């Protein structure tokens, strides 16, 4: 499948945390290109309505100890929403409450 026509949209939360982490526009382009190869290849997070998590290198840590980007690919809109980012040593996983909120957000994105 050709994913090259996908548009990326960043939530304000994602943009703020990306900048706070000191990541660059070049880092963002690398991330987008990795996701574009196959947006469905990253593991889906159970209970979120299709949100996926991709590992990214951060600082001196590789992908495993680095950061996590949370995103969702809305096929019908040909749009990938970059929802959140967190650094592994600051947070391990999304809480149940965060998953519920993100699931509602995905439903709104699909409808709108």
State where each predicted segment sits:
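Membrane-topology and secretion signals of cell-surface/extracellular proteins
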Residues: 1-3, 15, 34, 48-51, ...
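A short, surface-exposed loop/turn module that caps and links secondary-structure elements
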Residues: 34-63
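Enriched for short, Lys/Arg-rich terminal
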Residues: 73-112
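Compact soluble domain cores
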Residues: 13, 23-43
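Arg/Lys-rich, positively charged N-terminal/basic patches that mediate binding to nucleic acids
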Residues: 1-26
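Short, surface-exposed coil-to-beta transition loops
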Residues: 64-69
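Anionic group-transfer/hydrolysis microenvironments
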Residues: 12, 55-57, 86
């Amino acid at each position: 499948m050709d994913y090259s026509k996908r548009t990326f949209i960043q939530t304000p939360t994602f943009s703020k945390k990306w900048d706070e982490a000191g990541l660059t526009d070049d880092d963002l382009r690398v991330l987008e290109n990795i996701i574009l190869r196959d947006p469905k290849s990253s593991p889906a997070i159970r209970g979120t309505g299709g949100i996926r998590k991709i590992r990214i290198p951060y600082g001196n840590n590789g992908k495993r100890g680095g950061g996590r980007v949370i995103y969702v690919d809305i096929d019908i809109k040909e749009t990938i929403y970059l929802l959140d980012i967190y650094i592994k040593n600051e947070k391990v996983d999304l809480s149940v409450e965060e998953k519920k909120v993100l699931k509602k957000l995905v439903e709104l994105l699909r409808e709108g």
